C-alpha cells in the first residue's frame, strides 16, 4: 500500500495558517505561512500515485501504489532541488505545485470547510 516510507512532519504554523484561510475563506502567499527557506512546493492528496510523488521529491516518500493517509494532504518543499520538508497537513488544499510566489486561495466557499488551491496572482 501507499503508506509513507518516511516520517511525515507536521508544521503547526502551516496548519494554523491553512486553517485560518479555510475558516475565513481568504487567501495568502504560501511563503507567508512557513518559516523556512524553500523555492518549490508540491501538494499531493490521498490517492495520488506513489511514482509521481517520489519523482517530484527525488526520493522515496511513499512506498508503492497510491498515497494513503486519511484526511491528509502531503506538502513537499524543496530548496535548490533537495527536499527540505515533507509535511502532512489537513486535506483542504487541492493538489498542485508552485514557487515562492504561489498563493493559497479559496477554491470553493460552500459548503464549509472551504477548500483551498494554489494559484498565481495575475496569471
Report the location of each language-model feature:
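Extended hydrophobic/Leu-rich segments
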Residues: 8, 30, 53, 116-119
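Long, low-complexity intrinsically disordered regions enriched in Ser/Thr/Pro/Gly
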Residues: 15, 27, 35, 109-113, ...
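C-terminal partner/receptor-binding element of secreted or periplasmic proteins
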Residues: 92-123
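N-terminal, charge-rich interaction modules
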Residues: 2-33
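Mature extracytoplasmic domains of secretory-pathway proteins
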Residues: 22-88, 92
Amino acid at each position: 500500500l501507499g503508506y509513507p516510507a518516511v516520517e511525515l512532519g507536521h508544521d503547526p504554523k502551516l496548519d494554523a495558517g491553512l486553517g485560518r484561510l479555510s475558516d475565513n475563506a481568504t487567501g495568502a502567499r504560501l511563503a507567508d505561512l512557513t518559516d523556512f527557506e524553500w523555492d518549490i512546493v508540491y501538494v499531493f492528496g490521498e490517492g495520488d500515485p506513489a511514482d509521481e510523488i517520489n519523482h517530484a521529491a527525488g526520493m522515496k516518500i511513499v512506498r508503492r501504489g497510491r498515497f494513503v493517509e486519511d484526511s491528509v494532504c502531503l506538502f513537499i518543499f524543496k530548496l535548490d532541488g533537495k527536499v527540505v520538508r515533507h509535511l502532512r497537513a489537513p486535506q483542504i488544499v487541492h493538489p498542485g505545485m508552485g514557487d515562492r510566489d504561489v498563493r493559497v486561495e479559496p477554491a470553493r466557499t460552500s459548503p464549509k470547510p472551504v477548500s483551498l488551491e494554489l494559484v498565481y496572482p495575475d496569471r
